Regions:
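Phosphate- and divalent-cation-binding pockets in alpha/beta enzyme and binding domains
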Residues: 48-52
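ER/secretory pathway lumenal C-terminal domains and tails of membrane proteins involved
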Residues: 1-36, 53-299
């Protein structure tokens, strides 16, 4: 035991090192100060330090930490639909029976439906031109103005009472952009224009799971009025094909309607500089003699 203690003491010496707490604060400090932001996390190391800071130190209680691993469960969605401290409930409109365990665990992505839907709308438009406008009105009443728009897919397909319609009928979803909401949001606007639509690619995905459906629900319902972020530590497999719409502002990626592959702007340099130089804490690792283990180095 003496040999073990003498040879490995430094490996276990955490004195004056507050990296876990400070990095939790850094994630939260990366969020916009207004608007009750939401941050999606996924693992232990990017969730529990945030919860500690909010629950114990009362730090950024206006923000909501949402763990994607738990978002697959009904009890956690229940929690997210309730206010917590200074954070209002998350923008989820589903009734409990729509997400209770065993319901809507996943929804198949079936882009082969698109051909039939396009034909249905084309025929209805043809009938409308030939003096039967009710045909087009009825089709739009059943599937919406644009059947591939995010809110219509959630309303008329995913949440349909008809089990035959519980599919996502395209692998390319569009979301109409409220430009005034984007201008008010506080996000960086590259260039001088805001796109009319945001495009979400589901190519290669066979289904969307409940947690992913909840992400889309929140994105649609927040409508850029409430900032939504993804922790940088969340793997790309959980980005739901929206990585090209992320702009980094610190230890977080912000969801934006801009395609960064087209704008070339993937980083808000002003916010990043302010966070790194003026806000972030580094848990004492800048002090001489502090032991930095492999986990700290990775962070």
């Amino acid at each position: 035991p003496i040999q073990m203690a003498s040879q490995t003491w430094d490996d276990h010496d955490r004195s004056d090192r507050y990296l876990a707490r400070d990095f939790g604060q850094n994630y939260l400090m990366s969020l916009q100060e207004t608007g009750n932001p939401i941050i999606f996390t996924n693992g232990d190391n990017d969730t529990f330090p945030l919860w500690y800071n909010q629950e114990t130190e009362g730090f950024r209680t206006d923000a909501r930490t949402c763990n994607l691993s738990y978002l697959q469960t009904d009890w956690y969605i229940d929690q997210m639909k309730r206010p917590a401290y200074d954070s209002p409930s998350l923008p989820i409109t589903w009734d409990r029976m729509e997400y209770v365990e065993g319901t809507n665990e996943y929804i198949p992505v079936q882009p082969d439906y698109k051909k039939s839907i396009d034909a249905l709308y084309a025929e209805a438009e043809k009938q409308a031109l030939n003096g039967n406008p009710e045909a087009l009105v009825n089709v739009k009443k059943e599937f919406g103005e644009n059947p591939y728009e995010l809110q219509n897919i959630l309303k008329y397909w995913v949440r349909s009472k008809n089990d035959d319609l519980k599919v996502i009928p395209t692998d390319s979803i569009v979301m109409k952009v409220d430009k005034e909401a984007v201008r008010r949001s506080g996000m960086m606007i590259p260039g001088d224009s805001i796109p009319d639509y945001m495009h979400i690619s589901l190519k290669g995905k066979r289904a969307l799971y409940k947690s992913e459906l909840m992400m889309l629900e929140m994105l649609a319902e927040a409508n850029w009025e409430r900032p939504i972020y993804m922790a940088v530590s969340v793997g790309t497999e959980n980005h739901l094909g929206m990585g090209n719409h992320f702009v980094q502002e610190g230890l977080t990626y912000r969801f934006t309607p801009f395609d960064t592959e087209k704008t070339g702007v993937k980083l808000d340099s002003e916010k990043m500089y302010d966070n790194l130089m003026n806000k972030f804490k580094f848990g004492g690792i800048d002090k001489e003699g502090i032991y930095i283990d492999e986990n700290a180095m990775r962070m």
